[in-house]
Amino acid sequence: MIRSRQPLLDALGVDLPDELLSLALTHRSYAYENGGLPTNERLEFLGDAVLGLTITDALFHRHPDRSEGDLAKLRASVVNTQALADVARRLCAEGLGVHVLLGRGEANTGGADKSSILADGMESLLGAIYLQHGMEKAREVILRLFGPLLDAAPTLGAGLDWKTSLQELTAARGLGAPSYLVTSTGPDHDKEFTAVVVVMDSEYGSGVGRSKKEAEQKAAAAAWKALEVLDNAMPGKTSA
């Protein structure tokens, strides 16, 4: 039984015809198990282009002094599999994954929370919004959903990822290199990883993810923000 998709539409802030919404949510594994139904891959292709143009335009106007190379790096920090998957997980109270139509095998191996599937599903929804409502509505939805990522992009380091940014921050403050303690739970096909960042023998952030890399990135982001907040309390720092 397919659960109500209204919370998903409410989170997107648009209405979509049932047929178009179902297509946007149909993963190829489900299509193949059900007689070769159409998949969401064409919509994903379209949504990728709409997302890329919208983010590129936003960055171009937000950062008039940045070079082409810098803008490309900023865009890559916003438009990537992990960022898209994170937006998808926060899309509504239950996340996008529970609404994606998956084949039994994919569903049984944690496909509903697989970053690649969530990212593809997010792009296919954006493609569907563009088809139904046009570019301006698609742009409005994208800027609302990806606004926090656009805001955070300029704060990231040269590598445009949180681990690089944290390492640069701790080095600049003479705190040494951060270390990561990673644990995992669950069976091999459905593991959940938890990472904790340690700086100068103190824990500054933690993160949970479906992969070690994802958990470490989330932990690094939390630690970076914590260190920024505690700037004046860091060793070697004095209050103004």
From Swiss-Prot:
GO biological process, one term: tRNA processing
Catalytic reaction equation(s): Endonucleolytic cleavage to 5'-phosphomonoester
Top-level taxonomic group: Bacteria
Main location: cytoplasm
The keyword RNA-binding appears for this protein: yes
UniProt KW keywords: Cytoplasm, Endonuclease, Hydrolase, Magnesium, Metal-binding, mRNA processing, Nuclease, RNA-binding, rRNA processing, tRNA processing
Entry EC number(s): 3.1.26.3
DRBM domain boundaries: 161-229
GO cellular component, one term: cytosol
Subcellular location as annotated: Cytoplasm
Binding-site list for Mg(2+): E44, D120, E123
Catalytic center residues: D48, E123
Cofactor(s), names only, from the UniProt record: Mg(2+)
One Pfam match: dsrm
InterPro entries tied to this protein: dsRBD_dom, RNase_III, RNase_III_dom, RNase_III_sf
PROSITE patterns: DS_RBD, RNASE_3_1, RNASE_3_2
Family annotation (CDD domains): DSRM_RNAse_III_family (cd10845), RIBOc (cd00593)
Subunit description: Homodimer.
Family (UniProt): Belongs to the ribonuclease III family.
Additional remarks: Was identified as a high-confidence drug target.
HAMAP family: RNase_III
Record's protein name: Ribonuclease 3
Gene: rnc
